[in-house]
Amino acid sequence: RAGLAPYTYFADAGAKMYSAQDSWLTALPGAQRTAAAFELMYRLGKEYEKPEFGIHGVEIDGVECPVVERVDMSKPFCRLLRFKRYSDNEDRLRDLKDDPTVLVVAPLSGHHATLLRDTVRTLLIDHKVYITDWTDARMVPAEQGPFRLDDYVAYVQDFIRHIGCDNLHVVSVCQPTVPVLAAVSLMAARGE
């Protein structure tokens, strides 16, 4: 990727030159298409930073409850994040402890789990929330080996066992539906 950096910067400059309103290049035939091609090259080559979840609190029954994000389990290809709600009110704390638990299994590829922050924020109102945070495959050392479907299923099973509660709901978003169904089916067949 570092070798592509000069081309990425060049593509960004080209897109701006062919689309800037005060540039004479915009008057040339095909300028819009050229700008679009440069923009595409730029977007394919640029580095996208992983945004933060940024959930520090959630309003429950009109009262703001602080939320702390923490890594609950870490594996080479994924981290299991927990969003823990806090309260100084004993009654509210008791209610929070009685809430059901949900594991959100985010897609492995295509985007970061942080795009589900609104889903997590909404679930936090009346659930204990965990979410999978998959590691970019480029960042996993090659000695960890490949990550196949059976590994994916095993990760989901490990996360479910780690959470280990009687009232657990699992929500898969798009692509992980098949591995999640396989994981819970295998666990159910074993009586887990």
Residue ranges, per PLM feature:
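Phosphate/oxyanion-binding active-site loops and adjacent basic polyanion-contact surfaces
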Residues: 148-152, 175-176
